[in-house]
Amino acid sequence: MALGYVRPARPEDAGEIARIQLATWRVAYRRILPRHVLDNLDEAFLARRWSAAVQEPPSAAHRVLVAVEQAEQSYLVGFVASGPADAEALAPGEPTDALADGVVAVTDLLVEPRWGRRGHGSRLLSAAVDQWRSDGLGRAVAWVFDGDEATRKFLTSTGWEPDGAARALDVDDLLVPQLRLHVAVPAEETGTP
């Protein structure tokens, strides 16, 4: 088991978050998204977006957490971004009130492949759940690519399941199917005195 921890992202993490996103997408999604789309993603553009997400979130419940691997040096190795569900979390044609208050949407949950299978994804998800619980959010949703077996397997192993919603993203005239997973945010465990 790796030595690691999760902490809130800092403004100076934005460039590293963008690098992790790009590296992970280029490995994990190479058979899902067109190669030229992955090759043309702009790391500087992504870094600016992550900087804004960290420094100017739309609400206090919008958060970016990072996973850190501790060795001789510390490395950022993954991240999770989430916030209250909005129109982006809806399926096509779904009414705007389909995801009621109290639902959080995970927009990104990535661990760089070379750091995978070391507990970072579980630590990120656990830390996020703790924050969702403290924000009073009772259900979580996440869109995953239909062809992303690793993410689906990870999330379903922790209790997530499809909620029946599906959509297809238009990525440079290629429709890429996604399905929405959901899970109840577990109540905080209380110990007996």
PLM features: residue spans?
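Conserved catalytic-core motifs of GNAT/GCN5-like acyltransferases
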Residues: 141-144, 156, 161-178
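Conserved GNAT acetyl-CoA-binding A-motif
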Residues: 132-144
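Hydrophobic "lid"/C-terminal helical patch
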Residues: 17, 21
